[in-house]
Amino acid sequence: MAITDGEASHPGMDRAAAGQLAERRAAETSTALSRLGAAAEIVRLRIPDTGVSRREPEVREALRELVSGFQLCLAPWDGDLHADHEAAGRAARGACAAAGTGLLSYPIWTWHWSHPGDPRVPWEAAARVPLSAEATRRKRAAIGCFASQLRPRGPQRPPVLPPEVVAHFIRDHEMLIS
């Protein structure tokens, strides 16, 4: 599920440009999923970027319907220190509890503010999941599909995700929090 389309990541965009960015992000997501080898249908909620917490009950209900009947859901960690990630994580936690579906969470921005042993991170509930060489290759190819976030937007406009940030995402393992 894509809760938002990330259309607010580029400050100063007008409504038309933000709409175009949302469609570009949706296309990038589809391409990335194919690079991963996933044939999943993407459910787009189109919640406004930066507005997930204001619509959290709606997100929780949509997720509950989606995860019902599944054994496991992966969602952003609700302690990530990014408002939309945290709201998505809380909504997933509530949806999974209501549906009887297991939940594992993944940190996204955590890598930028935490350090080993950081007491804000539940390390005791975390597991390092190694990826095969093929999975790592596919993951890197999928990340490369997000040109709207990886490329500079002009001479004075750096990418949303500079190389030092992307380095956190292209590792040969994932960390999941139970």
Descriptions of predicted regions:
Residues 1-105, 141-145, 157-168:
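Active-site beta-strand->loop->alpha-helix modules in alpha/beta enzyme cores, enriched
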